[in-house]
């Protein structure tokens, strides 16, 4: 029922009725009354009752459409549970100071552990999320389950199943509007991830299946899988490999299609850095200086992907496979970071050589032209595990893909190229 209501809400926005405006301002009125009722300022202070507490903090962000986005984030939990108890709420409300067409945006996530499938470190939970922000409706409901033996957060299995709907109602926020279609998408999504160690080192298997329900869009399905393997060669020398493949049926919405270099457009909405244009300077994006990690991740072809999108002919593929390799070697600066009290437990600076190879494919015609690249890079990562040990943080990369098998017509195969990358596909 919740997803059907969200679907109807998305339809109302598409038809430009006042319903969505009423909903947004109702949320704003609710939070104003909430703050007034407790009579306390929202400045990283704790609002608490005997049975429940709310942690409040101001929040600022920027994009070209909203300008400076001013808001508040609230986190609700039972006192003393440290985000592993019942009735957990994460809520944000923002106002764009440019006062665009849709100035108020919000995000809400509610998590309730399911006692029958929950144990220490192995939570099973009911999840509900809803948001209208930066030109996108996104609403869903689902179940998540994690299995973690003991206290080692690097050994685990996770499974989830969601029913959700999303709809892009304002293209002004997007970097590349051609990478989105304008229909409401209702989908069922299942995911499974397993991480453990074997004789070579740690490995990670990640699979997902998306099934689009035939409502505004036609029926479609997409299956995606990746396998990462760490191979310890010697002390401080490791070879990390990744196999990736995605395949889909006809009628795939545009935002699900993959490019050779970067994550599909839908995945850009996960990070605040890439959700809207202007957070990262537009000139950097348009010049191909910023790479959004994901998909086949042939990072050396970022500039070609972006140039094609800007020219109105994006390189989009429903089926593509890839191999990514990174050889990590000692970095003296990483040793300096490790010696910093407290921060040294979470901050890392890795150096590596990389090689990527991939190709789109067709079940009748086989693989298309194979592309590859090679180079060197550095990754700064900050990871603070959450309450169940899941990785939480960010990865910033500086990559130098100095060789391409198929350079642009005005480039040489060997040439200095550099990229700032958001995220990482190899995270072992």
Which role does the model predict for each range below?
Residues 1-48, 428:
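Bacterial Sec-dependent N-terminal signal peptides
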Residues 44-118, 145-153, 172-201, 293-298, ...:
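Outer-membrane beta-barrel initiation region
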Residues 46-53, 80-87, 115-124, 149-158, ...:
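Short loop/turn motifs that connect adjacent beta-strands in outer-membrane beta-barrel proteins
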Residues 57-60, 120, 127-129, 186-193, ...:
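C-terminal outer-membrane beta-barrel translocator/porin domains of Gram-negative envelope proteins
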Residues 58, 72, 86-93, 121-130, ...:
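Membrane-embedded beta-strand positions of outer-membrane beta-barrel proteins
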Residues 60-66, 76-78, 93-99, 112-114, ...:
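Transmembrane beta-strands of outer-membrane beta-barrel pores
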Residues 101-106, 138-144, 156, 169-178, ...:
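Outer-membrane beta-barrel translocator domains and adjoining extracellular loop/strand segments
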Residues 375-378, 416-428:
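Outer-membrane beta-barrel "beta-signal"
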